[in-house]
């Protein structure tokens, strides 16, 4: 009975509980002396019934101790894992940062030949270069240009004085620009209306055309138009007959009678050509002109710009010979 009492003693159960602490041997040195005793008690266990009860108690205690030990181990392991994970995370971040830098550098190097990036980066670099280096050249060029402009302005002011033309008092030849400026200045002095940029419009009465019978037309206001143009009726009559290719004469009412059927538009076109060639000035387009005849030539002299130019003589068109006597004379000749 002494053996039975030793088996069911609560102290023995406690010692068997300490059996389950193999994981804490390193931390607690006292547990090693206690583990030696349960080994001796195993040799004393004689009966199987008692072993079953002891095993059931041991299983319960094992489950509890294992759960406690696992909790302790999980707690320590969690702390240790967190510390290690922090260190690993830092290393990974550093490695990833290095990789990112390498990747960015690798991406930037092949991206340089692209047109868009080259344009953007190249423009910025070129702007910096243009700002740095060409500034001095540009400043020098601007200074030279300003000096040239100032000299030109000074020359223009000096030449525009009352001393005369630019080439006066010097042996140099005059230039085309100087002569052109002189011509325009004289024209502005003589004709101040041109300075304002207003062009004179030559206003003329429209011709009045009336049919006479079936084969003739009458130009009613022929003499009035000759007075407006300041031209002789004979000259205008010769031009009209040559352009129209007909024959005509002035009757007692100072009306021009022309053979053929003509409309008002046709006579207007002929009058416009006559005014353009024999009335308006060829240089200033002024209608204040005089038609003069000198040695079989007609000269048109302008009263505004005092220019004088020759004018072509009026030539009659081809006329067919219809009379019998004229035909015989032509054959004889």
Swiss-Prot record:
Disulfide bonds listed in the record: none
Point out the cross-link Glycyl lysine isopeptide (Lys-Gly) (interchain with G-Cter in SUMO2) in this chain: 102
Q: Which UniProt keywords apply?
A: Acetylation, Cytoplasm, Initiation factor, Isopeptide bond, Metal-binding, Phosphoprotein, Protein biosynthesis, Ubl conjugation, Zinc, Zinc-finger
Function, as annotated, reads:
Component of the eIF2 complex that functions in the early steps of protein synthesis by forming a ternary complex with GTP and initiator tRNA. This complex binds to a 40S ribosomal subunit, followed by mRNA binding to form a 43S pre-initiation complex (43S PIC). Junction of the 60S ribosomal subunit to form the 80S initiation complex is preceded by hydrolysis of the GTP bound to eIF2 and release of an eIF2-GDP binary complex. In order for eIF2 to recycle and catalyze another round of initiation, the GDP bound to eIF2 must exchange with GTP by way of a reaction catalyzed by eIF2B.
Its source organism is Bos taurus (Bovine)
**Protein name per Swiss-Prot or TrEMBL:** Eukaryotic translation initiation factor 2 subunit 2
Name the gene: EIF2S2
Q: What Gene3D superfamilies does the database record attribute to this sequence?
A: 3.30.30.170
Q: Which residues carry this modification: Phosphoserine?
A: 2, 13, 67, 105, 158, 218
The family assignment reads: Belongs to the eIF-2-beta/eIF-5 family.
Comp. bias intervals (Acidic residues): 106-117
Under the heading PANTHER family, the entry gives: EUKARYOTIC TRANSLATION INITIATION FACTOR, EUKARYOTIC TRANSLATION INITIATION FACTOR 2 SUBUNIT 2
Biased region (Basic and acidic residues) positions are 40-51
Where is the PTM N6-acetyllysine found along the chain?
265, 293
